[in-house]
Amino acid sequence: MLRLIAPTLTLLLVAPLGAQAASKQEFELSTMLEKVAKESSVGTPRAINEDILDQGYTVNGKELINHLSVREGQAQQMRANPDAVRSQLGNSVCHNNGYRQLMTKGAVLKYQFTEYKTNRPVISQTFQASDCAVKKPGK
């Protein structure tokens, strides 16, 4: 009987420590994302180019969301070519050291595009650490 009680007691005492560690990591990630969103939103809205307006960042759980508005013509192109949009965004995200560091800590980056003035949804894309993993050639 004692053989069963000791391991069970140990598990009961250790389990909350693991939960606290996870909660601490989640709290630290959330705090970091809030800081990044606040700093990255300074000066918004701002034009990225003649077709894209950066409206700023928000945080939802582990997601850092970049809100972007695009002109109607750009919106049509993006809707017609979602794979090209994902490829271009992915290339940008995966080559950004700061974004990669956030993703290795569990963050998910989301780009949310809407049409300028109407706010009609255009496209949303999310990226996590596994999206930037180096693909090894097959043997």
What are these regions (language model features)?
Residues 68-72, 113-117, 127:
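A mature extracytoplasmic/lumenal domain signature
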Residues 4-14:
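Sec-dependent N-terminal signal peptides
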Residues 126-139:
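Short, low-complexity, Pro/Ser/Thr/Gly-rich segments in the mature regions of secreted, periplasmic
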Residues 93-123:
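A short amphipathic beta-strand at an alpha->beta junction
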Residues 47-71:
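Short edge beta-strands and adjacent turn/loop segments
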Residues 17-23:
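Sec/Tat signal peptide C-region and signal peptidase I cleavage site
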Residues 76-102:
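Short, non-transmembrane amphipathic alpha-helical segments
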Residues 23-41:
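Short N-terminal segments immediately surrounding and downstream of signal-peptide cleavage
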